[in-house]
């Protein structure tokens, strides 16, 4: 029986996945449509709008409302934690590294803005609905459940 010296098929696939993330021993550098993070941060708003997807482009071309303007000013300032209810603000390169707390309807969800989030809305990273976890039937749900002891 011939034994593969490299290992099983799973281990080979695992090594291939890992090699995509790391380029010759160093972490893969972030780029957005061919631009590095430093290039994106140096760009003017007009240049940045041209490379964003259509939905983000349309949102930024419109005049932001009062709450959006206020949040954008806070994100561009040196404040550490920014709490907000506004979920429809596009993440720009200037906001990378900031810690934001976004309201999900029940509580604030805290996260750090990473370069991969550029061009997305803040609300995309905060779930508003909880996953449903079903348990046993309640009292009166079935005929036999009438005789189940109450907790």
From Swiss-Prot:
GO molecular function: rRNA binding; structural constituent of ribosome
GO cellular component: cytosolic small ribosomal subunit
UniProt-listed Pfam families: Ribosomal_S19
Gene Ontology process terms (BP): ribosomal small subunit assembly; translation
Record keywords, A-Z: Ribonucleoprotein, Ribosomal protein, RNA-binding, rRNA-binding
PROSITE patterns for this protein: RIBOSOMAL_S19
Function in brief: Protein S19 forms a complex with S13 that binds strongly to the 16S ribosomal RNA.
Record family assignment: Belongs to the universal ribosomal protein uS19 family.
Protein name, UniProt field: Small ribosomal subunit protein uS19
Organism, scientific name: Thermoplasma acidophilum (strain ATCC 25905 / DSM 1728 / JCM 9062 / NBRC 15155 / AMRC-C165)
Annotated gene: rps19
């Amino acid at each position: 029986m011939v034994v593969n010296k490299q290992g099983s098929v799973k281990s080979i696939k695992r090594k291939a996945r890992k090699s995509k993330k790391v380029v010759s021993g160093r972490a893969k550098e972030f780029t957005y449509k061919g631009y590095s993070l430093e290039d994106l941060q140096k760009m003017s708003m007009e240049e940045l709008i041209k490379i964003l997807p259509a939905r983000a482009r349309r949102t930024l071309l419109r005049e932001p409302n009062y709450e959006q303007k206020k949040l954008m000013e806070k994100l561009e300032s040196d404040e550490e934690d920014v709490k907000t209810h506004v979920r429809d603000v596009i993440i720009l390169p200037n906001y990378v590294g900031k810690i934001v707390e976004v309201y999900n309807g029940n509580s604030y969800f805290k996260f750090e803005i990473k370069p991969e989030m550029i061009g997305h809305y803040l609300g995309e990273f905060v779930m508003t609905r909880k996953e449903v976890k079903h348990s046993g039937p309640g009292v009166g749900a079935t005929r036999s459940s009438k005789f189940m002891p109450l907790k």
